[in-house]
Amino acid sequence: DSGQLLIIGGDDKYPGAIILAAKMAVMSGVGLVYLYTKNQNVIKVLKEIPEIIVLDQKNRLNELLSYNIPVLAGPGTINNKWTMDIYDLMKNKPLTTILDAAYMEQIKSTDSLKIKILLPHEGEAARLLNVPSSSIKKDRINSAIKLSIKFNAVTVLKGPQTLITNGKNTFRCLNGS
């Protein structure tokens, strides 16, 4: 069993974000990748990654959310009703959640989500910590640690030499971002 992952995202403007996320999940060895996206993205996604299962009905998404498989929420989402409807389905469920930081900014409160991994770039990290972007650039390691402590999650601070920290141990990816 190589595990399962449910990816939720891909708004009108950013279907490429979910395509990239799903491709990387497959390439990293996830055995079964489910994807919930807007209807207009389904054909684009299946042309690029025919081996994943694309959900096109909210009731099927709700059923999968009850299975407690890990969820990557937010790649390619924007602040709108669709995004908030998904959050309403996810909240107060015991999900293991990987959150795109832009999604966190949209839903405003993550109290009802069990976040395990947070994926911000420097601009998103600055907004989540309520500091200028320049302070994140100046001290990426401490910024990532602060995010991990604030959200009690592993933080993957994307960028040149991506940082991964749980708030105690920090690793730097020297092979690109």
Where are these regions (language model features)?
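Small-residue (G/A/S/T)-rich helix-start motifs and N-terminal tracts that mark the onset
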Residues: 1-96, 105-114, 126-177
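Short, conserved phosphate/pyrophosphate- and ester-handling motifs at nucleotide-, phospho-/glycolipid
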Residues: 121
